């Protein structure tokens, strides 16, 4: 959102890329089931998404069954559910799920839902609430299930190799935690220039873009930019960040 905030004075020329996922479908049903388990082996991408998940609670299963049958959920369906969300400043955990609601349900927001549990302790808490069936819906970056796949089925008195506490479920997270909504892309970091400077000619901008792309495609460049977790750069345009501008409106 930083570029969107200052885009009156700056011009984006590049977007950082990251390793993408095997799935980028906008159809939530395409994300569900063991056969559709997401892998971290996709192409380089300039954005990531947030996903809205139905938990294995009795009502969460009802929501998942509707989506997997090709039905569109109504506002009443969603409003009946208990949601766990992250802080209001979280892009994947609050802002973009709010935008998803606004776009699909006549401007309704998370703040309009009847049953919302705000979480201050991160996504791990959301997944533990889901596993315990304490809530019906959680929201998280795509695809958070990768990071909790092992701990989901571990006994609660054990930890996985990354230190995550077991959640005691018996079925695969891919079968039990179903995607019911997919947000628009949340764009990555930018390389931007000042609109005020007279030095940025089209020729110089082209040269800068190619320079960054060439550098990061070397081993030395990867090492330099690893501090920012950037693995590549792609040429960007201002309209890529329209969603980020809409997000600013949500939190303003």
Language model features with spans:
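Pocket-lining segment of extracytoplasmic ligand-binding domains
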Residues: 67, 71, 79-201
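Short beta-strand and adjacent tight-turn residues that come in two discontinuous sequence segments
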Residues: 13-15, 139-140
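A conserved helix-loop-strand patch within extracytoplasmic ligand-binding domains
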Residues: 15-91
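Pocket-flanking alpha-helical
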Residues: 1-13, 20-31, 125, 145-151
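An extracytoplasmic/periplasmic, membrane-proximal ligand-sensing/linker region
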Residues: 104, 199-252
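Extracytoplasmic/secreted proteins, especially bacterial periplasmic and envelope-associated proteins
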Residues: 5-8, 96, 100, 122-125, ...
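Sec/Tat-exported extracytoplasmic proteins
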Residues: 4-6, 56, 85-87, 104-105, ...
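Hydrophobic, aliphatic-enriched repeat segments that assemble into extended interaction scaffolds
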Residues: 1-2, 51-53, 134-137
């Amino acid at each position: 959102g930083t570029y969107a905030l200052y885009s009156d004075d700056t011009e984006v020329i590049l977007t950082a890329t990251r390793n993408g996922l095997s799935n980028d479908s906008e159809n939530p049903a395409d994300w569900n089931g063991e056969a559709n388990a997401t892998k971290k082996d996709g192409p380089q991408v300039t954005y990531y998404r947030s996903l809205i998940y139905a938990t294995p609670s009795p009502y969460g299963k009802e929501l998942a069954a509707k989506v997997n049958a090709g039905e569109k959920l109504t506002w009443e369906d969603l409003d009946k559910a208990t949601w766990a969300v992250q802080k209001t400043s979280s892009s994947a955990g609050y802002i973009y799920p709010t935008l998803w609601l606004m776009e699909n349900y006549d401007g309704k927001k998370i703040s309009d839902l009847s049953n919302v549990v705000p979480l201050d302790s991160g996504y791990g808490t959301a997944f533990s609430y889901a596993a315990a069936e304490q809530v019906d819906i959680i929201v998280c970056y795509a695809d958070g299930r990768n990071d909790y796949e092992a701990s989901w089925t571990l006994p609660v008195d054990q930890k996985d190799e990354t230190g995550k506490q077991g959640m005691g479920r018996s079925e695969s997270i891919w079968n039990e935690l179903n995607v019911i909504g997919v947000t628009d892309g949340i764009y990555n970091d930018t390389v931007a220039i000042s609109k005020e400077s007279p030095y940025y000619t089209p020729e110089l901008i082209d040269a800068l873009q190619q320079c960054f792309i060439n550098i990061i495609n070397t081993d030395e460049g990867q090492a330099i930019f690893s501090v920012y977790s950037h693995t590549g750069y792609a040429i960007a345009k201002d309209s890529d960040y329209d969603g980020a501008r809409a997000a600013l409106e949500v939190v303003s």
